Amino acid sequence: MSRRKKETIANEFIIVPKDMATTPFFTVTPQENRSFITGCRRWDFNMPLTIEHGAVLYNILSFKDPFNPSRDIEFSVCELCKRMFTSDNSENLEKTRKLLLQLETAKVRIVDLDKDRYQIFRLIERIWIEGEVDKNLRENIATSRIKGVVIDKTFVEILEKAAEITGLNLQEFNSIRSKIAKAIYNYFIGYI
């Protein structure tokens, strides 16, 4: 099988924990101070994560080599936009940049209700930015300077230890334009 064919297959299909699909992990519209219970775990979010955030996260994970244990995922925002929207026009680039910055600040707390323990993690530990950036100007960073992300260590462990996983056809997911339809598709892949 050619290298290009392998890359195409890897980019079209990703594995995600069932909890991310069969629960309201990503909502259609932003919902503040959200939490939900699944099994013996309560998931709390510090910010609203919508299906658009899910689309960015899923597409970022599609750049990860499944055989490389590194948490570093290298890509350009243009490549990410082309995967998500099939176009890297300025509107899509700006939308993707904003969603990336929001994902970097998103924190999730999982409370084990049986053992009365919890863990807090971020989905994206940090964004790789080419060159020096003033902290006050970070919100206005140019998309061309974003070179990839580092996935949070705890989030990677959750992805690797997920007892129940499901597959997501990224090409189908990205072809859906309606947020509601995307959220429904995300939900139903957990039951396939």
Task: Label the model's feature ranges.
Residues 1-192:
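Charged, alpha-helix-forming regions
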